[in-house]
Amino acid sequence: VELGQVEIIASRSSVKTDAEGTTYRISMQGLPPKAKAVLALKRLPGVITRMEVFSLIGARGSATIYVDEVPVDPKFLSTLEAADIDRVEVRYMDHNSSGEGGAIYIYRKKAEHPVLKGDLDLSGGLLRPSWRLTPSLTLYSRAVDIIANASATYSHQSPEFHIYRNDHPELSIYNRAKVLQTGGQVFATAELTPRLRGTLTYAHFGLQSWHNSQVKQQGMVTSGKIRENQMRHAVNLLLAYKLGSNNRLLLKSYGSWMLGNDTDLRGMVDRINSRDVLAEIAYEHNEASLLGLTHRLGVGFGGRLGRNSLYDGFAPYRNRQLRAYVRDNVSLLEDLSLYFILTGQWGEYGRDRLYSYSTFTPSLSLSYELGGYTIGLRYGHSVQHPSADLLSPRVFYRNELEQRQGNPHLGPQYTDNWALSLSKQFGRHSLSLKSTYWHASDLITSVYTNQPNVLTYGNAGIGDELSTTLNYSTALLSNQLSLNLYVGATYADYRLAPSYRARALSYGTRGWSLEWGGSVNYYHPKGWLANLDLSADGLSRSLSHQQEEEPQLMLLLQKSFFAGKLDVSIEVSAPFGWGERMTETTFLPGIIQRKEIRISQSNVSLGLTYHFGGEAKRPMKALTTSPLSLDDVKRSDL
């Protein structure tokens, strides 16, 4: 299907639909020659952009981003060029990703001749002191590809917090902060043999902040300094060995290490030392014949070890898990596709006492093509185990009215998710409608039990959410104008579990909320680019709170000079302070608590980006160890 800005492609020309996901090839027409992947993904139907965070229509949470099947930080998309992308797969169900946000898989092209190129990006704030420096370098060759970047961001911020109880001011916090964020990523891919390909990634993230804080409560003023330090390292390794033209063996490993410490106004220091290691082996067969049908099969087995020390005087949190899965994608008919995942997990977690578990979580997706419409039905069951900070019995101090205490006896949370979708492509337009029902039992949530100043955690709730989202995308003016818009409504009902009704102060929340927004891009061939991102998500609810945020807006205007070698840009974030405020309301017996938060986002930034390096001498081809090679991909008969 040709949509102008993207083209829907399929692995088998005889199949009209795929229950696993949709594969797109993105056109460079209407994009700047040096456009990055983050701009290209905004063209995909069913993909929602919220301030350069990508999510899928109707999904809970953000989508996990993969490049050549290795997970990357979304900021990596600002380094990868759109012209280097072969295709993009959008999957609402993914066996590699945790959570319920789905995944976006990006597969790169392979250069036949060496290419060395890069960028140097520098920007500074005009209204508030801030600057950002981001150099990047890309090397493509026959043997190895390397994409590397580094970043440093510095800003002055002035967040404020005000707490009211029954409309009476109780506490105010004023901060004057200096924040330094650093980061770097290296993405390396090597053709070790004609059949063996390896991909190694390393990422570093650092945060340092210095706060001069002032607290006003009941006529008393307390001043002091707060310091925050965080550092995280993450490594991914993927080895893919092609056994034949349609089957391969995968070895995946992941490791992360995080260190951090926070100092509060009392001089107390909270420290964390977290380590996580994962390894998995998988086998995939893309053309297996069984019962007269062609299957795309996959099986995998792996293990995970985690250790988290909070330095709170208690034993470290430990997590050990074995995981196995089987998945199958089969076309039952020319216009009917089935995809399912069955995952088994066995493990234990806890601090002094380890809790053992064994779970099986099925996921199922059906896709049916009827008269040009694609109808999808999905079901997923998942189990969520509590994290280390929720299990610590120590009281973590934020201020006199906001203290949090973990619960070492927390159990798992069980969720079920049903989704019904309808999509249609006509001309250069795409329309998608998706309705979802989400149910959670033994909900892991914050709850007030003994006093309104201390929030603890428990399997205290039952949650239900019913939502419907409509997405419309199109390309106009020879693809120069791109629109991707969404609007949705959600009814949420969070209520106390029977075991907590007699002893909890929280009431639960329920009601409707509306979300809308999208992305609009215009590119003129003479080098002008305009991009507008708008996100208005209205109310969000949990068992103890309801939260309302102002709409967020970001506007970018860019002009290219010297044959596209230099870009000059102006970026406007949260104009006139619109989007800086958030209100959190809590309902307790005899108390309505309202917390107003204002963060520092409003700014106008001037940026310069210098592009250097050459292009490939010949057209790029797809990487050979991807599940679908460029030679195997054919246009769908849709």
Q: What residues fall within each predicted segment?
A:
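Periplasmic plug
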Residues: 48-93
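N-terminal periplasmic accessory domains that precede
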Residues: 1, 37-40, 55, 75, ...
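Gram-negative outer-membrane beta-barrel transporters
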Residues: 437-439, 458-540
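Outer-membrane beta-barrel translocator/receptor signature
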Residues: 98-104, 112-160, 179-184
